[in-house]
Regions:
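Basic, polar low-complexity surface loops/patches
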Residues: 1-148
């Protein structure tokens, strides 16, 4: 069974919890969860399938991340792929859980950053096109107009 299938199954039960998957010396989260983690820690999001993103971090960062989530009262569960995705650790703030609140904030900010990355990638991939200078001048003009 693929990791995304397992995550979807886990999220059916823990839909308002950040699910961390331990893979060796790294932890990964997927979908909405990755937006929240990227929002707080500026970890890079990786597109893994259609519009599903993931992000990962080394195990030595786990305590810092969990402390932040606990401070913000965001539920989480940690599962280990090697142990058939059994829950190793979890925190449940019950009605105080602020997962949705921070997901909405993260979705907006991270969504904007992803759009900027796509624009940047397009520009870099098309530096050899004849109209790229005109496009860049137009972008610079817009930035100047709005005083950015």
């Amino acid at each position: 069974m693929s990791i995304l299938t397992m995550i979807k199954n886990i999220k059916q039960v823990h839909n308002k919890d950040i699910v961390f998957v331990k893979l060796g010396k790294f932890y990964y989260c997927y979908g909405k969860d990755s937006y929240i983690i990227s929002f707080f820690f500026e970890y890079k999001l990786n597109l893994i399938e259609n519009s599903i993103y993931s992000c990962g971090f080394p195990s030595q960062s786990l305590n810092k991340i969990l402390a932040k989530l606990e401070n913000k009262k965001i539920n989480y569960v940690i599962v280990d792929r090697r142990n058939n995705y059994e829950i190793e650790n979890k925190e449940d703030f019950k009605k105080l859980n602020s997962y949705d609140k921070y997901y909405e904030k993260a979705k907006e900010e991270v969504g904007i950053k992803l759009r900027i990355q796509k624009i940047n990638a397009y520009l870099l991939e098309n530096t050899d096109k004849s109209n790229i200078k005109k496009l860049i001048l137009n972008i610079e003009g817009l930035l100047q107009k709005y005083k950015f």
